[in-house]
Amino acid sequence: MNRTTKLFTLLAIWIAVAAPLYSQKEFSNWPAGSSPQQIGKKLAQHFIETPHTNFGRPEPPTQITYPEVATWYGALTFAKLSNDKELTAGLLKRFDPLFGPEANLIPNPIHVDNTVFAAVPLEIYIQTKQQKFLDMGKAMADKQWANPTPDGLSDQTRFWIDDMFMLVIVQLQAYRATGDTKYLDRGALEMATYLDKLQQPNGLFYHAPDVPFFWGRGDGWVAAGMAEMLQSLPKKHPQRAPIMAGYQKMMKSLLQYQGSDGVWHQLIDHPESYPETSSTAMFTFAMITGVKNGWLDKKSYAPAARKGWLGLITYLEPNGDIRNVCRGTAKKNELQYYLDRERLTGDLHGQAPMLWCASAFLR
């Protein structure tokens, strides 16, 4: 081996060793009270103790809502990754009444926001192998594609950016539970189609095609959905390259809009809009996942992810409720509408991605 070859070999070894160590440094040595293990446990326990929610309204819900589904899913993955059997037991106990007196709360899977419920029983099956959970979740995943379009998409497709998480996670979970690649192929096709149709030249996504605003949480669902998909999509899958390209393009754009405090804003490219925590947690989750899997440059994105997490911690109440969560928002082609949206504390739109972040740090 000549001197030049030896130098290149040593350099390659150094890069292979140093890069993981760099991200380990950024994702450890947390200030007191801010570690993902501590925060994740607090939020998961708080969720177990919280009755079923209804989008911030005082009356009880008529069905399990999608923010609760997203939080339940995050709590389950955190409990598994932290090997916290007590948390897992509490999360399973929360589900028990849905097989009995609360069966009426199971959503009818005729719409994206309802069908996403399937992600929870499918995750429980993945962890427990209890057949009743697979039967429930798989039936919903199959119904979502009972009448596909000529292009092979679900008839629940509506080209709202939220769907890039809501719709895709059901098919991903069905794939993770069964190993049947038809579910993976469905979700990947759906995501690639949405990317092709909706991603803007700057890498971000309008809230709707006729509403040209980059609303934080809407884009957050997209970022989280792509991160989830890429974790399961094989390297040779035909949809992986376009999804990876869309993901990396979005992450590059987001990096320039992160505030000095680590937090993104209600409208991503409007720094005068308020700091918004649900979108920040979703973007942070996507970046943690990208760094951990080697999809993103660690030197650029590991510090951004750390800064995002620590910024979020400053909005946490002692009981685990996070502040500055934008209320559920329908589209409207009016800037002031987004600037004036109410900020909630403890809304599950914010609790959920905090748990996703805690899980991502532990993976």
Give the label of every model feature segment.
Residues 161-162, 172-267, 273-284, 296-330, ...:
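Extended ligand-binding clefts on enzyme/binding-domain cores
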Residues 40-48, 91-93, 135-150, 195-204, ...:
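Acidic-glycine-rich active-site phosphate/pyrophosphate-binding loop
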Residues 64-68, 72-75, 107-125, 159-171, ...:
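Aromatic-lined, polymer-binding surfaces characteristic
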Residues 52, 83, 99-104, 129, ...:
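Helix-capping and short linker residues that terminate individual alpha-solenoid repeat units
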Residues 133-169:
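Asp-box/WD-like beta-propeller blade repeats and closely related beta-sheet repeat scaffolds
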